[in-house]
């Protein structure tokens, strides 16, 4: 997968950073009411179900557990589910200091405090990237990692020099920090989500939820995400990993993936250091494949769980 200009990389980076849905998508059913809600350090945690094995859902940039509501509803009868909200997102207060380092440290505190043994981490986008990070930190404490379109390196960054990545990340953070909440909400609804979600009904449903996140915190998270490159650490991630990768020819072909196989090959190159990783492609879906193809996403998760647990 090649790109001919920085502008294409920037557009691709935005596409990977925020939610997207296909024309026929519909908002997933709501999750059941959580049995408990509590905080562990910087994390807000909602608990569902009482199964023997645990799943921990991590939403993506500027999102909350609402994006996983369909999967939470699907799996809550068989597993104990912990759905976390990262600081600065979905109404949670922002924090100072390093974000990924703080959130992952609090993740391990969650396991300690609730005596959670070998959970499967299921993350979307930035949450999937965090799943890769957790797998490199303490793989023996995890039962597996499922990442929905989250990678060990920000896709746009893979095409750029470190200097350009730094400049782009800093500029992105500063611009988002300059927005008022009203400007952030308007930009999401009118400039970002319409390019990433083809059904206007989905734009209307998701935009006010994304707008609950803090603009400056979203920029800071995005800056850290863009500067990450976990690829050298992947050999440490000796735990089963499933990468669920969406494909939509009408979008991906514009960024060099003219076929679903081309996108799979591109992704495979970015995760090739992981010793126990499998990629599942989901056609006719975009970044938010759990909205586009909910049954296919749930089936991929269920198949992985049947083997990993």
Briefly describe each language-model feature range.
Residues 2-55, 76-79, 117, 152, ...:
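Alpha/beta-hydrolase fold catalytic core
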Residues 29, 48, 82-122, 126:
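Active-site loop/oxyanion-hole signature of alpha/beta-hydrolase fold enzymes
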Residues 41-93:
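Conserved HGGG/HGGXW glycine-rich cap/lid loop of the alpha/beta-hydrolase fold
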Residues 117-159:
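Conserved hydrolase catalytic core segment
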Residues 145-179:
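Flexible "cap/lid" loop of the alpha/beta hydrolase fold
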Residues 157-163, 177-236:
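Conserved alpha/beta-hydrolase catalytic His-Asp/Glu region
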Residues 241-285:
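Conserved loop-alpha-helix segment in the C-terminal half of the alpha/beta-hydrolase fold
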Residues 282-294:
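Catalytic histidine-centered segment of alpha/beta-hydrolase-like enzymes
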